[in-house]
Amino acid sequence: TLKELGKLEEAVESYKKALNINPDYAEAHNNLGSTLETLTQYTEAVESYKKALNIDPDYAEAHNNLGQAFYLLNLTDKALDSFENALALNPEFVDAYNNMGGMLQDLGRLDEALNCYVSALAIEPDDAEIHRNLSTVKNYKPGDTQFDYMQALLTKNNLNDSDRINLCFALAKAHEDLGNKDDFFKLLNAGNELRRKELNYPIEKNLNIHSLYKDLFISTTNIIPAYEPLTIKP
């Protein structure tokens, strides 16, 4: 699609033309809203999502997207209602659980955020992004089954770099909680190496960072952004 190609303004015009032909095209309203949201036109995105829902009140994806737009406008109560509406319509809507978890975490409601991530993983246990998000609000204990599951996931050969990065950081956090210093630094370094590769970041800027962290061994929440939850997504 034009949006996937990064041609956002052209995508907006394309959706508007489609809606001129068929104003009751709920999916086009939703897609227009998603594109406007990407363009940071959040108020306009809300209006598009609302139009989609006026046509199809049971459109779970539009409820989820509306929740995201409300959250980006700092309308957190409305956002929560929208995420809950999406989940009432589709109790296995992983993105809605993940998005609601991210919002609740940002609001400091960590137990509720943890429950959202756990619910999402119960549906999609191989989702590396959600494993990472859960790791940001969880304190790992010996014998944790999620820890074992993440270790098994990381051995799979078909992981893309993004999934591997998420699992490395999630497992690094788990090893930190468990006091496994060497494994913590090994996985932290592996995740950062992959992320630098993904971002095309000059490696020479980080030649000494691993040894520096190992010497200090202080809480990573104060020195790197690796454990911050990922942003919500449509």
Region annotations inferred by a language model:
Residues 141-157, 166-233:
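Non-catalytic membrane-proximal stalk/linker segments that position and tether the catalytic domains
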Residues 1-4, 27-38, 61-72, 95-105, ...:
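Conserved alpha-helical positions within TPR/SEL1-like repeat arrays
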Residues 126-128, 160-167:
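Generic helix N-cap/helix-start motif at coil->alpha-helix transitions
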